[in-house]
Amino acid sequence: MIKKRIIPCLDVKDGRVVKGVQFKGLRDIGDPVALAAYYNAELADELVFLDISRTENGHQMMLDIIEETASKLFIPLTIGGGISSTDDISTLLKHGADKVSLNSSALRNPSLVKEASEKFGSQCICIAVDAKWEDERNDWFCYTHGGKQPTDIRVLDWVRQVEYLGAGELLVTSMDYDGVKQGFDHQLLNQINTVVSIPVIASGGGGNAQHFVDLFQQTNVSAGLAASIFHDKETTIGAVKTYLKDKGVDVRWH
């Protein structure tokens, strides 16, 4: 059986790590390189950087951060945010990224998923899905631009399509659960797992170690991603992994 992974996520804006609740109200958390080194020592299985900078200067700072971070990490580094071409992907990989996460650009141009997976390999291409339940339309829909822009694309249709186009992994964020620390969106995740066979990383709602136990016992996702509880030192990745192991969940130990 594949061991379950715990992944911290760092939202980086203009060179600083920030965090909000349900994609709003950003607050400063700290220096990305220092936090990455901390999580590397804390037994994180991977690290995700999402570049939410709005400026060219912010994106350039991100490349410097990736390069410095990659030189200090012994775990895979995934970069997302503002990636719109295979040239962008190539630049990130050259600066030290192991994987890239595509979201808005893939929804805008699905052929990018196929082109990128063929050029760099499926294992390199993760599709980030910001999913929100809409009562009026009775389904989950994809959102873009950091959760600000609704689309008419149903989540289940989209994940099927990107798997077919060659994506190697999904990073699924439940916008309804994001940052509120009440547990993961099992219903959404189980629906996705019924229509795809590629690994799914669950994001949005992790508030304590029991939430990760519930996630891995009640869904078939391969990893759980969180930010708030780790950034705020409410618990550590090591403590979560120990708790998971005690509850019979097979986790990675480095």
From Swiss-Prot:
Active site, per annotation: 11, 130
A single GO molecular function term of this UniProt record: imidazoleglycerol-phosphate synthase activity
Keywords: Amino-acid biosynthesis, Cytoplasm, Histidine biosynthesis, Lyase
Location in or out of the cell: Cytoplasm
The reaction(s) this protein catalyses: 5-[(5-phospho-1-deoxy-D-ribulos-1-ylimino)methylamino]-1-(5-phospho-beta-D-ribosyl)imidazole-4-carboxamide + L-glutamine = D-erythro-1-(imidazol-4-yl)glycerol 3-phosphate + 5-amino-1-(5-phospho-beta-D-ribosyl)imidazole-4-carboxamide + L-glutamate + H(+)
Pathway participation: Amino-acid biosynthesis; L-histidine biosynthesis; L-histidine from 5-phospho-alpha-D-ribose 1-diphosphate: step 5/9
Positions of transmembrane segments: none
EC number: 4.3.2.10
One of the GO BP terms on file: L-histidine biosynthetic process
Calcium is among the record's keywords: no
Family annotation (SUPFAM superfamilies): Ribulose-phoshate binding barrel
EC top class, as a word: lyase
GO cellular component, one term: cytoplasm
Gene3D superfamilies noted in UniProt: Aldolase class I
Description of how the protein assembles with itself and partners: Heterodimer of HisH and HisF.
Role this protein plays: IGPS catalyzes the conversion of PRFAR and glutamine to IGP, AICAR and glutamate. The HisF subunit catalyzes the cyclization activity that produces IGP and AICAR from PRFAR using the ammonia provided by the HisH subunit.
Family affiliation: Belongs to the HisA/HisF family.
Protein name as it appears in the record: Imidazole glycerol phosphate synthase subunit HisF
Annotated gene: hisF
